[in-house]
């Protein structure tokens, strides 16, 4: 299948079903809020390294987590019950995203400064969100221990990346995030590519064609955009 070069003058994407065998749909374009939102609504996401052109992907199969189907491992339930972690939403979005890139810097990261600024704009518009986990240090001050960020459109949440500085910190943030999604009626969390980590939490692979159908129903849900800073965590 051909890979399309995106035109600069409009934000439309070719159909995700036209991706090549690796899942690549298109190259080029920019990271404007309008283009990013159009991509997510089409089941497409950006993923590239510094120095490369912008690359846009739609993988087949697609890994998806239904929020009510979240599986929390027994050992993690114990860590949550101990209550050491404090959970917040959208308090330090920029810091969470930067840390997600920093922990992967040695092996190469797609979270470039350009990407950070693009998603910060989405965050300021109420579409991109973070969930943070904090641990108290020896001076009784809470320090950022882990977090996760992604994009929300209607009843779909697109998980982008997570990081941790302390054991279980990102996992607790994930459980808190998915709990919030379930409470608010979100239909799906797009995990993009298959990992054993997310499979353990109840995510399942689905054909891209099925994912795209489910996605259109999810983004049509009347869940408004907006910051989550006042959300009370369920854990």
Swiss-Prot record:
Pfam family, one: Leu_Phe_trans
This protein's UniProt keywords: Acyltransferase, Cytoplasm, Transferase
InterPro entries in the record: Acyl_CoA_acyltransferase, Leu/Phe-tRNA_Trfase, Leu/Phe-tRNA_Trfase_C, Leu/Phe-tRNA_Trfase_N
Cellular compartment(s): Cytoplasm
GO molecular function: leucyl-tRNA--protein transferase activity
Reactions listed under catalytic activity: N-terminal L-lysyl-[protein] + L-leucyl-tRNA(Leu) = N-terminal L-leucyl-L-lysyl-[protein] + tRNA(Leu) + H(+); N-terminal L-arginyl-[protein] + L-leucyl-tRNA(Leu) = N-terminal L-leucyl-L-arginyl-[protein] + tRNA(Leu) + H(+); L-phenylalanyl-tRNA(Phe) + an N-terminal L-alpha-aminoacyl-[protein] = an N-terminal L-phenylalanyl-L-alpha-aminoacyl-[protein] + tRNA(Phe)
EC number: 2.3.2.6
Gene Ontology CC entries for this record: cytoplasm
Main localization, broad class: cytoplasm
Family recorded in the similarity comment: Belongs to the L/F-transferase family.
Protein name in the entry: Leucyl/phenylalanyl-tRNA--protein transferase
Organism: Magnetococcus marinus (strain ATCC BAA-1437 / JCM 17883 / MC-1)
High-level lineage: Bacteria, Pseudomonadati, Pseudomonadota, Alphaproteobacteria, Magnetococcales
């Amino acid at each position: 299948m051909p890979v399309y070069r995106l035109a600069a003058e409009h934000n439309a994407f070719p159909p995700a079903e036209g991706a090549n065998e690796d899942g690549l749909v298109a190259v080029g374009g920019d990271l404007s809020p309008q283009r990013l939102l159009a991509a997510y609504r089409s089941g497409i996401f950006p993923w590239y390294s510094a120095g490369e052109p912008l690359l846009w992907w739609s993988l087949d199969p697609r890994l998806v987590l239904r929020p009510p189907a979240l599986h929390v491992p027994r050992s993690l339930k114990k860590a949550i019950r101990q209550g050491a972690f404090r959970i917040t939403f959208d308090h330090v979005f920029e810091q969470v995203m930067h840390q997600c890139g920093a922990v992967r810097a040695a092996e190469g990261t797609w979270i470039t400064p350009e990407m950070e600024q693009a998603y910060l704009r989405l965050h300021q518009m109420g579409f991109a969100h973070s969930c943070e986990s904090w641990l108290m240090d020896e001076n009784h001050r809470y320090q950022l221990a882990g977090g996760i960020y992604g994009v929300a459109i209607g009843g779909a949440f697109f998980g982008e990346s997570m990081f941790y500085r302390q054991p279980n910190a990102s996992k607790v943030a994930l459980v808190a995030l998915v709990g919030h999604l379930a409470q608010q009626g979100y239909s799906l969390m797009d995990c993009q590519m298959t990992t054993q980590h997310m499979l353990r939490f109840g995510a399942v692979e689905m054909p891209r064609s099925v994912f795209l159908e489910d996605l259109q129903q999810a983004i049509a849900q009347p869940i408004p955009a907006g910051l989550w800073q006042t959300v009370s965590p369920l854990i």
